Every structure is written in structure tokens, then in C-alpha cells.
């Protein structure tokens, strides 16, 4: 079970939700199930409108997570994938700070997910 805190300037306070790991749910899906309004358009990782900033709350216990070529290209195009994080993702499968909520699969890690409420803003 993962605890996910959603945070946005448009929300009066952070929303804490529990998510089942292994269900193959995306962050966007978990947000929608819990009334959190992360902006989105395509839900396929092409547009970048569901950009979020993720902070892992489990310290050093960050799990590997595949960054697809599609997501990598979108993050690079919006300037949210520094070279150091791109290399870390490619070599060690460690996730970058910014992700697309529609492409990020929920695991058993506790997360803080921040978004501005504007499409593509994080």
C-alpha cells in the first residue's frame, strides 16, 4: 500500500490517499479516483499536460521505474529532464523528479505529487 499526497496551489490542503501497489494504476488514475484534478488531455504520454513533480518520501528506497522513450521525449521537450536525471534513468532505471501522471505506475512507495493545476505546469 502506498500513501500519496497530492499538492496544488488550487487545493485548500494536501490530499492524502492510499493506493494499492500492483494494481497497475497510474498516478493520474489514482488522482481521478480520489477527486484530485490533475490537468490532462491525451492520457497517452504525448502532450505533457499532466506534468507533475514527484518527491519520494521513503528516503533512499527509491525503486527503479522504466522511463519510456515517449515520456523521455516529452519531458526533454518541456525542459524538465536534466541530463543528469536522463542518464540516471537510462543507466539505473531511477525515475526523474518530473513525470507524466498518465505514465507513472503506482508502486508501494510513499510520494508527494505536486502540480500547478495548469496544463503542463508542475
From Swiss-Prot:
Induction conditions: Expressed in nitrogen-fixing and non-nitrogen-fixing cells, although transcript levels are higher in nitrogen-fixing cells. Expressed during log and stationary phase growth (at protein level). The gene is monocistronic.
Deletion consequences: No visible growth phenotype, but shortly after entry into stationary phase the nitrogenase subunitsare destabilized and are no longer detectable. In vitro nitrogenase is highly sensitive to O(2).
Domain 2Fe-2S ferredoxin-type: 2-119
Cofactor note as given: Binds 1 [2Fe-2S] cluster per subunit.
GO biological process: nitrogen fixation
Cofactor(s) listed: [2Fe-2S] cluster
InterPro entries cross-referenced by the UniProt entry: 2Fe-2S_ferredoxin-like_sf, 2Fe-2S_ferredoxin-type, 2Fe2S_fd_BS, Beta-grasp_dom_sf
Assembly information from the UniProt record: Homodimer. Forms a complex with nitrogenase consisting of 1 MoFe heterotetramer, 1 Fe protein dimer and 1 FeSII dimer; the interaction is electrostatic and disurpted by increasing NaCl levels.
GO molecular function: 2 iron, 2 sulfur cluster binding; metal ion binding
Main location: cytoplasm
Annotated compartments: Cytoplasm
Binding site for [2Fe-2S] cluster: 42, 47, 50, 102
This protein's UniProt keywords: 2Fe-2S, Chaperone, Cytoplasm, Iron, Iron-sulfur, Metal-binding, Nitrogen fixation
Protein name (Swiss-Prot/TrEMBL): Protein FeSII
Domain notes from UniProt: Has mobile N-loop (residues 59-96) that changes position in a redox-dependent manner being folded against the protein in the closed reduced state, protecting its [2Fe-2S] cluster, or away from the protein in the open oxidized state. The open form complexes with the MoFe and Fe subunits of nitrogenase protecting them from O(2).
Any single GO CC term annotated in Swiss-Prot or TrEMBL for this entry: cytoplasm
Similarity remark: Belongs to the adrenodoxin/putidaredoxin family.
Originating gene: fesII
N-loop, as annotated region: 59-96
Consequence the record notes for mutating residue 56 to Q: Considerably decreased protection of nitrogenase
Record's function text: Binds to and protects nitrogenase from irreversible exposure to O(2), in what is known as 'conformational protection'. Shifts nitrogenase into an inactive, O(2)-tolerant state. Exists in 2 states, an open oxidized state that binds and protects nitrogenase, and a closed reduced state that probably does not bind nitrogenase; cooperative oxidation of the 2Fe-2S clusters causes the conformation change. Does not protect nitrogenase with the vanadium-iron subunit, not clear if it protects the iron-only nitrogenase.
